[in-house]
């Protein structure tokens, strides 16, 4: 039996593949390389010393999803990462985001039920909570008052999966609500390598640190936070990947619907992260204050106690280790995976 990792060549997907292989699971990876590249999977093989099946496939193409299952009998679990993921871009391209992100999961669900596959772990997001009334955020907080289309696609997909779980007693679903993944594998072989100018904070800081970009743009310093910049719950991507392994085991032990935050429970501001990265790379990094971005909120950090209690999982890395590993990745791969070409 094997696990289909859709979007497995991406940032979180590739790190999760490492943890799955290290834990002894057989995997099939499907990706269309929209925001990823083959080099990431080559390096997953190098890190683990293990091979796996890869299929180049677009999850929005129903026939392509069907082919993945037909040609790989024995898939009994899916970890669904495939999605567009840039919050800012989603504001300007809502149709593309709704179409892509919903259809990826709808197609997978439709094919799963015809191939006796009854377990799916969905890559959700803290954006489902919108602008929370208070922090830390618990899983029983209201969802749906999202501030951008990306977050709304996660809300809609969660609802689809929940409804399918209610309708099909055999279907088991884990909704993992990530906070802000950063960092890279400690080997420095895989990390975040966005196409074009990064949308997320740490890849942008890293590009400044290696001289690829001039300065960090800080979007807003007038939020009601200690230093006026946005506060987020940053989580090391390796910790996050290990959370998926824990979720697989959870569904084996207790079928049904499971919803869980994956974060550290600590909030760090944009300036906190810039200072931590400066420490990691050994130089002060220039930054400029810009106006707020549409869709951004003041602060977002979680109560991670459910993950510890029910998954037996908790984050091990702090902000210094996250920035250390990001810098290790970026300094050895200044052009990302293109460095290897």
Model-derived regions, located:
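A general boundary/transition motif marking the beginning of the first structured unit of a protein
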Residues: 113, 192-197, 295, 314
